[in-house]
Swiss-Prot record:
One Pfam family it belongs to: Tctex-1
Cellular compartment(s): Nucleus; Cytoplasm, Cytoskeleton; Chromosome, Centromere, Kinetochore
InterPro entries: Tctex-1-like, Tctex-1-like_sf
Molecular-function annotations in GO: identical protein binding
Organism encoding this protein: Mus musculus
PANTHER family: DYNEIN LIGHT CHAIN TCTEX-TYPE 3, T-COMPLEX-ASSOCIATED-TESTIS-EXPRESSED 1/ DYNEIN LIGHT CHAIN
Swiss-Prot/TrEMBL GO biological process terms: cell division; positive regulation of mitotic cell cycle; regulation of mitotic cell cycle
Protein name: Dynein light chain Tctex-type 3
């Protein structure tokens, strides 16, 4: 993968660091926009691609999975769940919730440690 660096010896997934990276990506893509059904595919693709790119640039020994859902805001709410079976000492996840007056966005990051 382009931009991949030899992993450092840090153990454990830093969810705060990943959260901040992905939040910046979401702000950059969705910030200032209103919900538009015609833009959803482009927006979600941009969010996951930018997030993966920035996470990989950290040079840590992880495989990343990033999911993104953008829905029009409604009084009915938006519910999502995920579950993982893995090594909690090295693998990790974080969820980023973003909203404005017209839409809600949920991004999940899953980081699975690469054991060499």
């Amino acid at each position: 993968m382009e931009g991949y660096q030899r992993p450092c010896d840090e153990v454990g997934f830093n969810a705060d660091e990943a959260h901040n990276i992905v939040k910046e990506c979401v702000d950059g893509v969705l910030g200032g926009n209103d919900y538009n059904e015609n833009n959803i595919n482009q927006w979600t693709a941009s969010i996951v691609e930018q997030s993966i790119t920035h996470l990989v640039k950290l040079g840590k020994a992880y495989k990343y999975i990033v999911t993104c859902a953008v829905v029009q805001r409604s009084p009915y709410g938006f519910h999502t769940a995920s579950s993982c079976f893995w090594d909690t000492t090295s693998d990790g996840t974080c969820t980023i919730r973003w909203e404005n007056r017209t839409m809600n966005c949920i991004v999940n990051v899953f980081a699975v440690a690469i054991v060499l």
